[in-house]
């Protein structure tokens, strides 16, 4: 029902492919790409569930039209910094890759069009993400954020899976394990804490690198980690279990602080130095309570599949259920959403 109520799941909604994708401090047109990718994803889900070929044909049309129209890719404009270029490529790339992966078996998507789409998504989004993770645009890796590295990693992994490209898959996975930047799981965690409330046993609350920045970005890392781990899981690689479920530990810490934003929370916190902003001495309250998709995936994987306790993630999933596509419940520039539909066990 949530999916059917979304205006982006309507095959009659007009899409709007652009010649280039750009993002800057005043906005840009990247949202146009994100919402069209979200529409393709939601229509692909409708086709996969119901077999509705009208939805399938529209999803394919969106993907084909973007591949044919967006010839200038993610361009550097006079208003756009390198970080804006990276964020446009990182967040849009994986969102186009996901509906394409669903639709790859649809007989109505011509083989030559599918091959052209794979070429387009690779040349448009991959080079920027690879360059950024390689040298962070000639800056120090610690000067960046988790929410910069993670979408770049996710887009490379998603393109690798879509294109059956083992080199891209392995690059993204290696970065998760041992990369220099904040997307590496070793660098994502500032400190491990015990839960003063006793709901999480042992030192299994992981304070993430952006908890002292603001909660809008800290909560964004939950779906990014969730989608990255799920994409790997779909090809037989279990990152969810890595280092005794450390991704869950990150999510539990974030959920504990954000799930009930008006309540006082006894939250242990370790001050840390950010290369981008200096010392973060207290947990940031800005944006506290931000609701994003991703909690259903985390909850269902850890609790329903693995049988692991995840009280705060479970509470967040229950709060947002049924999960739509972003805070607006339809589509959002950073998140695919619809986890209740996709991951409920």
PLM features per residue range, with description:
Residues 1-138, 150, 154, 174-177, ...:
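Extracellular glycan-targeting catalytic surfaces
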Residues 145-148, 217:
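Histidine-centered active-site/metal-ligand motif
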Residues 167-171, 191, 197, 210-235:
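Active-site-proximal binding-pocket segments
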Residues 178-182:
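Solenoid-like repeat scaffolds
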Residues 183-210, 277, 281:
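Flexible internal linker/loop segments at domain or repeat junctions
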